[in-house]
Amino acid sequence: EVYARAARVELWLNGRVVGRKALKNDCLAKFSVPYEPGRLEAVSYDAQGCELGRCTLTTAGQQTQITAGPEQSTVQAGHLCYIRLRYTDEKGITKPLARGNIKVEVDGGTLVGLGNACPYHERSYLDCVADTYYGEALAIVRAGEGSSLTLTADDGMYSTAVTVPVTR
């Protein structure tokens, strides 16, 4: 399924067109495409044939790791730092089917929230462990007064750490 507010959509699989559809008022085009690893790209066009946008999905590799990415490269002392935790491959492509309970530890700050976007998430957001939802979770850390904060994430199989400079 491709959702777009456009006149038509093309679907590309690994560099070749596998379908074209005109869209109606529901902004939905359905395609049936056999699975093939690689790159699936939807390109939307207006009535004059000008490109409006594109969206790409890429198959993740075999290797799995936890990636921790702060929303901003620095944080002010006392302010909140949002750190996205994801299961990814070696190229940083999210692996939405990977799932685990990630334990978070913070040095140089305070963990104020940890969770995911799952609508039936049963754990407390104040806990230091969160299950991933479609391969992702989010940690919210209040920066301390030191020069940096470090978040370590570990699920018992994979681990990562990220350090964020703290400014005053």
Where are these regions (language model features)?
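Extracellular Ig-like/FN3 beta-sandwich strand-entry sites
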Residues: 35-39, 78-80, 146-148
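Beta-strand-rich structural segments
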Residues: 2-3, 43-44, 78-96, 102, ...
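Short aromatic-acidic-glycine turn motif
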Residues: 63-65, 105-121
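Beta-strand signatures of extracellular beta-sandwich domains
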Residues: 8-12, 43, 101-105
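Short beta-strand segments within Ig-like beta-sandwich modules, predominantly Fibronectin type-III
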Residues: 19-25
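Short proline/glycine-enriched turn/loop motifs at strand-loop junctions of beta-rich domains
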Residues: 2-8, 97, 146
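Short, hydrophobic beta-strand segments
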Residues: 30-35, 126-145
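Edge beta-strands of extracellular beta-sandwich domains
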Residues: 49-61, 158-167
